[in-house]
Amino acid sequence: MDVAVVGRLVTVYGVAVAVAAFIAAALSDLWGPRRVMVLGATVWIVLELLFLGLALTTDTGWLIVLTYGLRGFGYPLFAYGFLVWISAVAPPEDRATGVGWFYVAFSAGLPTLGALVATVSLSVLDLTFYGTLWISLGLVVLGSLTALVGVRERRGRRPLVDNPGDVLATVTRGLRLLRDDRRARYVTYIRTINSVPTYAMAVYFPAHVTGTLHWPLGRFLILTTVIYAVNLPFNPFYGRLGDRLGWARTMFWAGAVACAVTLALLYAAPLAGRSLGLPDGLVFGVTLVCGALFGVSLAGYVPLSAIAVSLDPGHPGAAMSTYNLGVGAAVAVGPLLVAVLHPLIGATGLTVVMVGLYLVAAVLCLALRGTQPGFDGVPAADAPASAAPDGATGPGTRSAASSPTP
């Protein structure tokens, strides 16, 4: 399949991820995060079995799209249900740090271990792509059992709100928050931009690496592994830094601005090196360094989830739904940008667009100042939502003093 076709297929998957990521938070308020995680693991495993055992073996096009797409409902329910769980039980002053540790595990799994397993399976064990997918399913089962059996915290095993019987109000609270508080929308936009390049690069960068740079596909997998392996320790680091120096300030400099600069370097450095006739090994080494810097910069967005919860601390699931929507939207928007723009402007144009998006995110980060107690003139005892941006009086305008903290 060419780049545009892959982009369309992954976009279908991404739409499912976006929907599931949003409802994972609302359902966590309603049912409790652990039940949402069980549902997510079940959906993924069952649909992956259908995808591998039936759709691919019969080469049925519509069934491949259906099972691959619906499978996208699984992992957000599991992963972001767990993120809501952490956000609900972490003390406010350490919330960004707790989220940072979540992303240590997330980055160690999906992009890092995933790329490493693919490298070993394809290059060392000489398995096919199909065989590698079966190995990935085994890892999903193992990881699901580890989380569901190993985590014993009690609050996440029950609804996070006091009135779970009011199903409609609980499920739609996140939507009302998006409607009434523009900062909630900014959270969604920033979180989408944070991950759009990584999902887009997964679609168009392999062809760029093999076709333009004339490197083997294994080098793309190594680059991906380096980006997310280096990212790991900086997730809790930037979480702690945000808790101590300011969430919005950390995101602006360490996240948005740094991502714009390092993504540009990651794309331009190998092209410049080859045009100058530098040794291939040196060019690849410089590319890995740029990739590592990009991985560090991606961690600069960790404090964003703490900002999301601060907008409605009495309903952490609803508040996190605005953040999770951005996570899921990135899975769809990234490949969609590739499908639409790659035929028109190529890899270079796409990269310029994504650098521009990071600069837009930097501007939006400035609008989130004043959401952290103890910073930007907000008293430490007060909630960040004392002044509603849209003149709203609904969710997102409550103060921590009048709302139970998670």
Language-model features, listed with the residues they occupy:
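Short amphipathic helix-loop junctions that connect adjacent transmembrane helices
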Residues: 1-4, 203-219
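Juxtamembrane intracellular "pre-TM" segments in multi-pass secondary transporters
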Residues: 153-188, 391
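Cytoplasmic membrane-interface "Motif A"-like loop-to-helix N-cap segments
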Residues: 30-41, 244-257
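Intracellular juxtamembrane helix-capping segments at the cytosolic ends
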Residues: 77-90, 298-312
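C-terminal ends and interior cores of transmembrane alpha-helices
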Residues: 42-58, 258-279
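Helix-to-loop junctions at the C-terminal end of transmembrane segments
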Residues: 21-32, 234-247, 342
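Glycine-rich segments within core transmembrane alpha-helices of 12-TM secondary carriers
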Residues: 100-115, 326-334
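Cytoplasmic helix-loop-helix junction between adjacent transmembrane helices
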Residues: 67-106
